[in-house]
Amino acid sequence: ALLDTGARADTPEQTTRRRDLIKLADRGEFKAVSPKLLPLLIHLDRLSDAMLVAEILAMADSVGKDAFLRQQNAIMRRADSRPGLSAIECPTLVVCGREDVLTPPDLSVEIAGLIPGAELVLVEDCGHLSTMECPEEINAALRNWMTC
C-alpha cells in the first residue's frame, strides 16, 4: 500500500521550501518547523483539533532534528520513479487524502494509473497525515484491500 505519496522528483519550488526549513532547523529553530508545516500536513478544518495538533507536534519532536534533516535531504535527492511503476506486479493500493497539499491527489491518481491493477482510494476531508486524521477510513480501505 502506498499512502499520501508521489512518484516524481521534487520540483525546484519544493526543494527551495525544504532548504528553507533545513536552514531554520540548522539555526536552532527546529521546534518552529512543525508549526510552519501544519497547514500542509493536515486538513485545514483539523488545525483547531488540539489533540491531533499536539500529537503531530510531539511526534515531530520525538523524531528529532537529525532525522528530519536526513528525510528532507533524501527527498530532495529522490529520483523520478514513474518509469518503473509499470513493472510492479503485486497487488497495490494507493491512498491519499483528497485535501492533501503536500502530495496532492493527482499524484496518487498518476501512480495508480501507472501500476497495473492498482486500486485508488481518495479519503474525503483529509490531508497528508491520513493515518492520523482519518484512521477509521484508512483502516477500512486497508482491510477491504487485504480481503479482496
Residue spans of the language-model regions?
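A conserved short beta-strand
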Residues: 1-7, 11
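Active-site loop/turn elements of alpha/beta-hydrolase fold enzymes
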Residues: 5, 75, 125
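Conserved alpha/beta-hydrolase catalytic His-Asp/Glu region
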Residues: 10-16, 28-87
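Hydrophobic "lid"/C-terminal helical patch
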Residues: 37, 72, 111, 138, ...
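Short beta-strand/loop motif that positions the catalytic acidic residue
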Residues: 88, 94-96, 100
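Catalytic active-site module of serine/aspartate enzymes centered on a nucleophile-bearing elbow/loop
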Residues: 116-148
